[in-house]
Amino acid sequence: MISSEISYSVVVPVFNSSHSLVELRDRIDAVFKNEMKETYELIFIDDGSESELTWPFLNGLSKKYKEVTSIRLMRNFGKQGALLCGFSNAKGRYIITIDDDLQHFPEDIPSLAALNAHDVVIGRFENKEHNLSKRIFSRVNNWFETKLLGKPEHITNSPFKLIRAEVVNSFLQIKTPNPSLSALLFFVTKDVKNVSVRHAKRPYGKSGFTLKKMFETFASMLFNNSSFLLKLIAYAGISISFFSFLLALIYFIKKLTVGIPVPGYASLVTVTLFIGGLMLFSIGIVGEYLIRIINGVELKPAYVVREKSEG
């Protein structure tokens, strides 16, 4: 629900963090009150943190500062589910997503806000302070987002972004238990801009976004928001069937023109390839229908709230 009193909602997914949150809140507060002169709310989403310190810390922040709202999920639903929870509770005309580890500079928020006439403004990091595996994953993920999700080719995606409330309200109507924020965004709008922002080294602890979670995020995009693999199987089936048909035609022509006998194993291989290709093609077609049916009837929630604390 959009509130006329709040201009910006800042959504921060939190997992096992506490050391960085006071500094993050203070810097965000200074940006909005001293530089932008805008009203804001700060929404922390505790995504099932394993640390027993995280929720009491967030609860304390929301009791101390009227701009802060803290929400605790029942378990770890993943970053995408946590973001959707934050979006559902946001009241601002513009929603900003930022990580909890201080690698994103709150001081760059005005750069995003300067382009808020666009539906989505995404921070493009000038120099990434990620390790090699994260940088590789980011490049691969960006390529697939362009090819599978319709992300404009000139746009680089990142977690640091500004989204107009109208866009958020539109994709919140799409109910899916395995959400991909990128898939939802690029389905709703193509009015997306990049702006250069800074990227800092992580000052506290280690990232909770492990290789396993990277793979799970990528798999969710691939399986739940795209029929790419099914189409790949179908195309492979067609190609194999076509190849086996050509092979059979060649053997048949040789038999008629030259009189070369067709070996038994050759005809067996040809028939096997043809049948196998047809089976793969059929599975792809059936799977295409199946995934559409599942997407239509699956209504499991993307997150479940345990408790909420407001200032």
Predicted regions mapped to residue ranges:
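Hydrophobic helical membrane-anchoring modules
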Residues: 1-6, 180-311
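Structured catalytic core of nucleotide-sugar glycosyltransferases
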Residues: 1-132
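Residue-level signature of catalytic and energy-coupling elements of molecular machines
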Residues: 10, 28, 86, 101, ...
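Residues in soluble alpha-helical coiled-coils and helical-bundle/repeat scaffolds
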Residues: 15-19, 103, 172, 176, ...
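Membrane-interface junctions
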Residues: 51, 76, 174-177, 224-228, ...
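Solvent-exposed polar/charged
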Residues: 63, 88, 114-115, 138, ...
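Acceptor/aglycone-binding surface of glycosyltransferases and processive sugar-polymer synthases
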Residues: 73-75, 80-89, 94, 106-179, ...
